[in-house]
Amino acid sequence: MALQGPIPVEFGLVFPAGVYAAGAFEPVRDFEASASGRFVQSKDKATGVPLWVVEVIDADHTARARTVKVKVAAQAQPVLPAGPAGSPFVPVEFTGLTVTPYVNQAGRLGYSLKASGIRAPGRPPGRPGPEGRESAA
């Protein structure tokens, strides 16, 4: 089969109504390497770069899952773009988005989402934002 591993997808195809970050990025725990209270951060299998995860809220009111976790590989903790003043939710877009299908413990098809970077919505790829650079891996 020609398709193996993560499948590249456009952000708008996965999230046509956009998403809102519901908190900051957290390190992904490597459950096999972490033991007896010792935390080990998971690394990207292809690059060896540390993995971070952020929970996002799908703005599509018809979406089956309202919240989704998206992983980003980056040497340092990614920073969310500035959001609207006074709002706990930050609109974001992911760059270099991939989806990896898998069968979950209940025997149902699930999807893992991973991105190479994050930015404010509506900004063309590679164009710096107000912070002067695109947050990415």
Where are the model-predicted features located?
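OB-fold and OB-like single-stranded nucleic-acid-recognition modules
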Residues: 1-137
